[in-house]
């Protein structure tokens, strides 16, 4: 348990988040903007706060995040993953409740590539028998 700050890297789809936890009052800063400014969508804000609410550390830390790549939901998921990892670095006993909630596991689902001769990844052109 370091006194200055804890770090966690989170990933989801093509988004990557670098998360720094410092003792503070509960401010969340993402790319030098507030949480409410960065995410217009309430669901994305809820996803980011989930690990803090679960471990009851909402007002215990100031969180500084740098996130790149992906879209809104991917970035929110990456930040959640990063916060989870930083919390585990801060206190190893938080691992088991976070694991039970499913926040520790990296969501491995990625976009499937488009194949040659198909319209999308799996959608085929219409078949004509005659």
UniProtKB/Swiss-Prot annotation:
The keyword Transmembrane helix does not apply. GO terms for molecular function: RNA binding; structural constituent of ribosome. It holds the Pfam family Ribosomal_S9. The keyword Transmembrane does not apply. One of its GO terms (biological process) is translation. GO terms for cellular component: cytosolic small ribosomal subunit. Keywords: Ribonucleoprotein, Ribosomal protein. It comes from the Bacteria. NCBIfam families: PRK00132.1. Belongs to the universal ribosomal protein uS9 family. This is Small ribosomal subunit protein uS9. It comes from Pseudomonas paraeruginosa (strain DSM 24068 / PA7) (Pseudomonas aeruginosa (strain PA7)). The lineage of its organism: Bacteria, Pseudomonadati, Pseudomonadota, Gammaproteobacteria, Pseudomonadales.
């Amino acid at each position: 348990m370091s006194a200055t700050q804890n770090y966690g890297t989170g990933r989801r789809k093509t988004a990557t988040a670098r998360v720094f936890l410092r003792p503070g009052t509960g401010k969340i800063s993402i790319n030098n903007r507030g949480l409410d400014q960065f995410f217009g969508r309430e669901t994305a804000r809820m996803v980011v706060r989930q690990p803090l609410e679960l471990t009851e550390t909402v007002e215990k830390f100031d969180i500084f995040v740098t996130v790149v790549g992906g879209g809104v939901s991917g970035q929110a998921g990456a930040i959640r993953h990063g916060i989870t990892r930083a919390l585990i670095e801060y206190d190893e006993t938080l691992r088991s409740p976070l694991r039970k909630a499913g926040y520790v596991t990296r969501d491995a689902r990625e976009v499937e590539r488009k194949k040659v001769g198909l319209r999308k990844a799996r959608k085929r052109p219409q078949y004509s028998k005659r």
